[in-house]
């Protein structure tokens, strides 16, 4: 009982967040931290037994799934739940996917220069 009550007063650490806005005003917020386990999983996805195109698509989806925190589209209520973010990503059109891929590349270069972008 004593340990639980001591933890309640502590602030939880939060990963830094970086917002990226497209030309239409949509805002994608990406997490600025990645665990060593996530980095190892990403390396497996990139080197997996898939053909190059499939590995590339899967690596973009993997990074989006792990790094996306919030996505505000057309001024609507932001999407924040992981399942909803991933579903919206899968529903995205070609232009949105191109922008997301470019945004992920920029984000990796700024925050994770040791990782190979998709």
Where are these regions (language model features)?
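Short acidic-hydrophobic surface loop/beta-edge motif
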Residues: 13-25
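Short, surface-exposed, charged amphipathic helix/loop patches that serve as local interaction elements
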Residues: 26, 31-118
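RecB-family 4Fe-4S metal-dependent nuclease core
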Residues: 8-15, 57, 72-73
